[in-house]
């Protein structure tokens, strides 16, 4: 079944791995299913050349460096050290950037996504739930294949998005909000579940698309959203289709 998503021409993708991230295998599997030629690269050995050869760069989920300072902070410093300029060149040159969960936290700290922070959930504890989402950014290259409402697994302790006063509303008006929660469990400002930059080529989201690749990954065995694929697959496939 997984081979059914493969295109005739592979597109290169770089998946950055940090100490403590734990979704690398699932994310690689989803990317390959969508058609990408995927390379998992530890951040300690990643080079600007790895980025330059890739059309999509993904920062995956987990607990980079154990989240010992704040989520994504140490990973951000290491990413800036090894790849900061390369990632900005990649983005400016038309490449795609995707941050999932911890990767979203890292992208906000790198300044690639609109200024914001992801802090402790409203309930001040780790929660693993399914999140119902609304697609806000209709022009996002990552969301074209998804319906207006869908759901994905979510698992984090620091996923409450906060901004400077009034900024969340500005992001919503400016088209920077990619996804919103239907049930805003984390207490995010404007119910924001995902942000994108002004071009749409960089996006971050807290829920995990790689964890809903196939219909059998859904909690309801009778889920009838799609016969062959879970909603997460279509996020990666949308990115694949968007690349020339």
Where are these regions (language model features)?
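Amide-donor transfer/coupling interface in amidating biosynthetic enzymes
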Residues: 44-47, 53, 86-89, 118-244
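Cysteine-nucleophile active-site neighborhood
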Residues: 65-140
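A structural preference for short, hydrophobic beta-strand core positions in alpha/beta folds
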Residues: 40-41
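Alpha-helix C-terminal capping/helix-to-coil transition sites in glycosyltransferase folds
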Residues: 5, 52-53, 93
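N-terminal cofactor/phosphate-binding cores enriched in small/glycine residues
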Residues: 56-61, 66-67
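Short, charged N-terminal beta->alpha structural module
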Residues: 11-34
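Single conserved hydrophobic/aromatic residue that forms the stacking wall/gate
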Residues: 1-10
